[in-house]
């Protein structure tokens, strides 16, 4: 059973073992509060001050303590940590034995405490082994006060846990979080509700420390539950929520040695603390037995030195079987029982989450017992309402229903508005909730008993909603919506406001015209109001804003395919920029859905208060040509500058930008200082490039008559900056596509027409007509496209591509887009790939449909592609990139063949970080002869940087014939058997020309092998 915290000790935060790939950083601060991104949906962030579980004053392995915890736990200078541990005799189980470490009075060896450093990096203080001394290490002692009084503030009042989901999570991740919360609600009396004005609540956030959470209610404001990299799995989130509810890890309970054995020698160094157990006074198991099946239990190999080494070994049961531990699928029966005890859930009642259901008084219709107490929590999809009908009612009748009664409240708990209290034998009228939850409570205290009651409920999707803000979701979200549903919501906000609607997630059966399942939105109160849009598919619709205070939303599903559906937030929207003070903005106010931002005119930038403007570099330019430079050119530019130039040319002109000098801080990432160039004047216009470093960008030409150039520097390193010249040229292609039938390419002072793949230019220079499309390609890399890409390919078309690469390098095809008429056997339109020079070679695959094929790699230096379309359906086609991969299996024959170190040998030096293995195989009875024509590889005394190795066999386990680097001719290399392996390795710095060799098969098998 997971350890529920004793009410007096719910104070620690617990960092969980991370899943594979999760990142951990040591960015710990002395302040356990952080500013996190928060929002109602993706994309619109605000700042929230919350307790950050990744920032702690002291770390004990995976347990972190903040300043309040240090005071409560009396962390002092070293006392108990350095005392020799007292070993106790182990239990005879017939297996591995050890004396489990006690927390905090003794510790495993090499344990460590992580304390914060000013530079944000890990600072680890290693605790000395018992009996050793370490005068330089700063050590700590933890003396935990036993729980002597209750601390009820650590339990969530009424079992209600308000939550907020941070703005950096996707719709899929949000759905997982909600599924995990509904799972806890389904089996316990804990309730998760979206936060309104509650002071204490949890915030789902993406933190660098991976998966972690406080244990129980922290109090004093919001607290984060970190769902970091690779943590967004249902079981992991449910586990984290277990900590929020108030559970420790199961294996740390005081009686764990009776059930599991800790194998200390298999634990990763420095992670021993994760296996310390607590004292009986520090936690309470509430009388529940040890639960191997708990979702809060570590797995057998958690924090193991190797994936197949056990760190926790369950003891055998009566049948000699070791129980399974570490499941992350669902709450165990023990988890459920303990949570119900911790939150004092009524023994009678349950959480009902189906769209229809029924419930009755205990013992119905044979009579209910005295002093019964039952609670039913009905929870359906947000945006739905609940219709509750009593079909039978027979309760002891009293004035004001004082003794026996059933009470219905319009919400999620006992303090929600009362819809009615009933007793006697009169059946109540139908009750309808105002939202998606109902609370039903039954109590009996009289000795005069009746039959009880029976009630049925049904979820009703859609309806009239009159409130400032809320949420609507497809029926059964986040699970698949149900077939044949029609839901209509009529949303009304106060007069003078607009309705704003933003989507958190969206997945509705896809169709070109949304003919099957769809979401329809209209600007007004009825189905005759102006249509805003019909939506389906998997892309979230843009945010919607009504023209008045009403919005009509309709969801329809047919009888077949069902998807996850949608979740959307609605709210009253006002244009803050229409206020007399324009939102406090000095120059320009930009209204956004649900908020607004201030902006400045060209030549100005926002000051630190984000409302006033100050003079800046950049400006608004209307000249046909000119020069722009970074601030201070040719001297170093200043720090913390943001300059925007908006260049505008006459209509039908295009603007070209040519950099004459360029030197900025940064590299390929460009996250410090950079120059951004866009077609258009807005900061979200089409991006041509983001540039930094010392490499001069290519000439950039705008797509319209506007160009935006933005320069930004951070607060550290400054460089010389840049100087660029811009000039404008009339774009003949801007009007009527220049008269070109397909593509028009603007050139300086003129233009030319061009045809798409599969077509050729007519003699008139403007029209295109179909042509054969058989291509021979010998370049190392490039792009392939179906005919007429990106429009639909023509019917009755056959195209071939014969791709050949440098000898010794395999051709690779990677698809970026793919859409060809679907057929189970690809009998109609299809793309075929062959492992050779023509269609007689072995076939690598035939593809059709809309799923992108995985990358295809030939076994040799040739690959043949054949595209075929029939006379009927046409689709968009495909776009792919061809490249090369080094290495592979080569066949040595009497005829001489070539081998090159890299595909662009002769044109470019070999690349960095190359790892190439070639296996050259001759026929039985023959050996391999390798003769180098050119050899130029970075030189080093031991050939430790770049090198070529030869092995007398199929792999690197064969005898090595030598490792080679430097320049100059090498002697011939002969194999003793029928195979020779060549390995080429390069590091990440100096690159040279490479090597060119010829190989052939030979009967000269007793030749001298070349010495290193």
From Swiss-Prot:
> What taxonomic classification does the UniProt entry list for its organism?
Eukaryota, Metazoa, Chordata, Craniata, Vertebrata
What's this protein's name? Tolloid-like protein 2
UniProt function note? Protease which specifically processes pro-lysyl oxidase. Required for the embryonic development. Predominant protease, which in the development, influences dorsal-ventral patterning and skeletogenesis.
**Region ranges (Disordered):** 83-135
Please list the residues that bind Zn(2+). Answer: 239, 243, 249
Subcellular location as annotated: Secreted
Chain positions with Omega-N-methylarginine modification: 960, 963
Question: In this protein, which residues make up the domain named EGF-like?
Answer: 573-614, 729-769
In which residue ranges is the amino acid composition biased (Polar residues)? 126-135
